[in-house]
């Protein structure tokens, strides 16, 4: 499964609204567009037209990841996901797992602490350990749906990303580059780099002075 940014946003919104506002689910095109363009709980914030959202819906329909529904006496078409936990989906997830995947689709890579804080309307995690346990399960599936990203400089927690809109090869490449010495040096900020360069210069000067003293000592003994 490979989702574009717009497709991932649509699926994330459908997953979210199914849980948080079940009385309004399935969603009309207008309601779904508003959900996609929310200023809060979205990263990045988008400004999609209804036409763009419809394009994403058409594409998802071809992938059999959404379905259309029309109510009796209503001409308004509404949309529901077939992403997981349906008779048509191979992906079966717990409520906790749905919450984590939904948040990652809507807000990009996040730490377990961030996921716990932001998931209160989707699922009640007791603590961060429960989030981490769920993440571990999702990563250890026969076909993993999450991956751990390299820890950012100065950060204590690693972030995790979903693999529906991020290729596993990209994640593996990022992990490999983070383990290499060049990645460590590239991660240094400008201030750290300047301090290191100043320290190297200072050490070089000290070595030069010691060499001069050693040469003088050798000359006096000969």
Swiss-Prot record:
Protein name: UPF0502 protein Shewmr7_1629
Domain of life of the native organism: Bacteria
Family: Belongs to the UPF0502 family.
UniProt cross-references to PANTHER family, sorted A to Z: UPF0502 PROTEIN YCEH
Organism of derivation: Shewanella sp. (strain MR-7)
InterPro entries noted in UniProt: DUF480, WH-like_DNA-bd_sf, WH_DNA-bd_sf
